[in-house]
From Swiss-Prot:
Keyword vocabulary terms for this entry: Ribonucleoprotein, Ribosomal protein
Protein name in UniProt: Small ribosomal subunit protein bS16
Pfam families assigned to the protein according to its UniProt record, in alphabetical order: Ribosomal_S16
GO cellular component: cytoplasm; small ribosomal subunit
Molecular function via GO: structural constituent of ribosome
Assigned protein family: Belongs to the bacterial ribosomal protein bS16 family.
Species, as recorded: Blochmanniella floridana
InterPro entries referenced in this protein's UniProt entry, alphabetically: Ribosomal_bS16, Ribosomal_bS16_dom_sf
Amino acid sequence: MVRIRLARGGCKKSPFYYIVVTDSRNSRDGRFIERIGFFNPVELDIKKRLRVNLDRVRYWLSNGAQPSDRVFVLIKWSKNVY
């Protein structure tokens, strides 16, 4: 099953997350099919905090990809920001 989920990046105590499309059997930070955005929870500016390619999200959702709970909330939030 293909999932849209967060992959952690950044340094210790300074998280940075990539929004990736991956097979559900792969590890959290492992192999991915496509990187479709990022989320920086430390950033204060809303425009720099989250960036999502909504066209690619729609494409993957139409092909049956399942978003994680957190990614689902971020996608809804990004539609309101942009």
